């Protein structure tokens, strides 16, 4: 810290004074004053980080504990991109006396992989921006004073692994009704596994469409504020993916596990699933006991319009007749009414459209009935709006192409973000190959294990450190703190 203090005294104070003098002369230049101070404070922060890292490395070099197992091999510079900017510092390569393998011990203590160039805080900022805008913007926002390439952002996102929802409330919640809304977005692929692998059909159209799935669980709807006409979901939780086959079934199992771990399901009167009746949704519904499918209003009205659009001024009356038949009559009576409406067509034009609508409503007959009967607890669905907000805004509203891996990871990242997930915790969740020196053996540790180990060690050493913290200098306290990490080498 001594060098940082000298830097502050010799460089920063004079620059601060110059900035203040300029501001006093031109009081309307407050923005420039703030910008100037911000830049200087950034530089000071980077100097402090650099000095702290080099102090740690020097303590490793001087440590008698380190000397028992490791010898100094070489010194080299390293650049790290932090959320504050790039830090260039010197570090030491050590060689193990037991194994003959070389390693930068400071990297191990910091939890940084051998080829890692971006710190956790910078990566968290990168993900927080990329999930909302683009890979390019994610790279630009990684650091205040530098940036990384869009390819780096893409690689980081493609490598992401997401934690399962294992956090359980202390007490399960009791509610009368639960709602599951499900829908999908269609995105364009650049390729599936590798470039050039998209096939064409007989009409020379590329098979480049991929379904991204959205499911969200909530307890109902309420007004955003007492006087607002806008509604919002109560306690929503989002799930996204591009799962197919067996993966789709596991996707729905994860949703049910969330319900089971957060709610007293035996106290719930009904669980309603609002959807368009897609096959991937119906296969999931079959895996969950006690749920009732409700056809969402958007798709029901869409197909009623297909059945009645040719009726012109009588369109509303015809649509209401169809609703009445669906609500309280039989499939046979519905088909008779559709046949009657087809009789008003001019020639064969429109037959295909009406037959498609007839088949759709018949395939979702019970779900359509439930929607129109408005049974206890049935509420309006918002699937189309949520698909636009959750998936389309980032993945399909602007011209862009994806790979299957990229689409899967971004969909999951969108869900994590909307569930208020902490990006720093997500970065730390990723597995890192960090060797643990113990008799020359190396184990792969996850960041979760590392954090747990650090917590245990703090509990063991904390009482001792606290007992002497009032009687030793600041510099010596740092030595005590850091030596606790060297003892593990």
Provide a role label for each language-model segment:
Residues 61-80, 368, 374:
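Short acidic, Pro/Gly- and aromatic-enriched capping/linker segments at domain boundaries
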Residues 70, 75-78, 82-112:
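Cys/His-rich short segments
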Residues 42-69:
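N-terminal accessory alpha/beta regions
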Residues 1-51, 94-489:
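Catalytic center-proximal scaffold of phosphoryl-transfer enzymes
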């Amino acid at each position: 810290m001594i060098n940082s203090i000298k830097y502050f005294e010799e460089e920063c104070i004079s620059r601060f004074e110059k900035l203040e003098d300029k501001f006093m002369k031109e009081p309307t230049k407050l923005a420039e004053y703030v910008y100037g101070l911000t830049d200087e404070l950034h530089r000071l922060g980077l100097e402090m980080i650099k000095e702290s890292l080099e102090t740690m490395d020097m303590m490793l070099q001087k440590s008698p504990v380190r000397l028992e197992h490791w010898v100094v091999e070489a010194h080299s510079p390293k650049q790290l991109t932090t959320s504050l900017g790039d830090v260039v510092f010197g570090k030491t390569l050590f060689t193990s006396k037991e194994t003959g393998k070389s390693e930068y011990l400071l990297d191990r203590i910091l939890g940084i992989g051998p080829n890692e160039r971006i710190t956790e805080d910078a990566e968290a900022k990168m993900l927080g921006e990329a999930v909302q805008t683009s890979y390019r913007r994610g790279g630009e926002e990684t650091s205040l004073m530098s940036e990384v390439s869009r390819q780096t952002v893409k690689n980081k996102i493609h490598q992401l692994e997401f934690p399962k929802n294992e956090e359980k409330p202390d007490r399960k919640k009791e509610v009368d009704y639960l709602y599951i809304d499900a829908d999908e977005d269609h995105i364009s692929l650049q390729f599936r596994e590798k470039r050039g692998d998209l096939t064409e059909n007989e009409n020379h159209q590329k098979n480049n469409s991929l379904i991204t799935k959205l499911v969200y669980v909530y307890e109902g709807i309420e007004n955003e504020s007492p006087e607002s006409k806008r509604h919002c979901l109560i306690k929503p939780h989002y799930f996204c993916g591009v799962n197919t086959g067996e993966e789709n079934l596991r996707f729905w199992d994860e949703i049910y596990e969330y319900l089971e771990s957060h709610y007293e399901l035996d106290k719930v009167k009904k669980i309603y699933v609002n959807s368009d009746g897609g096959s991937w949704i119906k296969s999931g519904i079959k895996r969950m006991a006690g749920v009732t499918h409700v056809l969402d209003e958007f798709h029901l009205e869409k197909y009623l319009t297909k059945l009645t659009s040719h009726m012109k001024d009588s369109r509303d009356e015809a649509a209401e007749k169809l609703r009445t038949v669906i609500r309280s009559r039989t499939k046979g009576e519905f088909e008779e009414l559709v046949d009657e409406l087809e009789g008003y067509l001019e020639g064969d034009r429109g037959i295909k459209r009406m037959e498609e609508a007839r088949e759709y409503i018949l395939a979702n007959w019970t779900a359509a009935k439930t929607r129109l009967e408005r049974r206890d607890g049935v509420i309006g669905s918002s699937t189309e709006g949520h698909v636009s907000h959750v998936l389309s805004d980032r993945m399909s509203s602007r011209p862009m192409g994806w790979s299957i891996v990229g689409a899967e990871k971004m969909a999951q990242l969108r869900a994590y973000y909307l569930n208020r997930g902490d990006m720093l915790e997500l970065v730390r969740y990723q597995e890192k190959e960090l060797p643990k020196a113990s008799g020359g053996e190396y184990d792969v540790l996850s960041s979760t294990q590392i954090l747990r180990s650090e917590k245990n060690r703090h509990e063991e050493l904390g009482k001792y450190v606290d007992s002497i913290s009032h009687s030793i200098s600041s510099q010596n306290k740092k030595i005590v703190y850091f030596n606790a990490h060297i003892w593990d080498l």
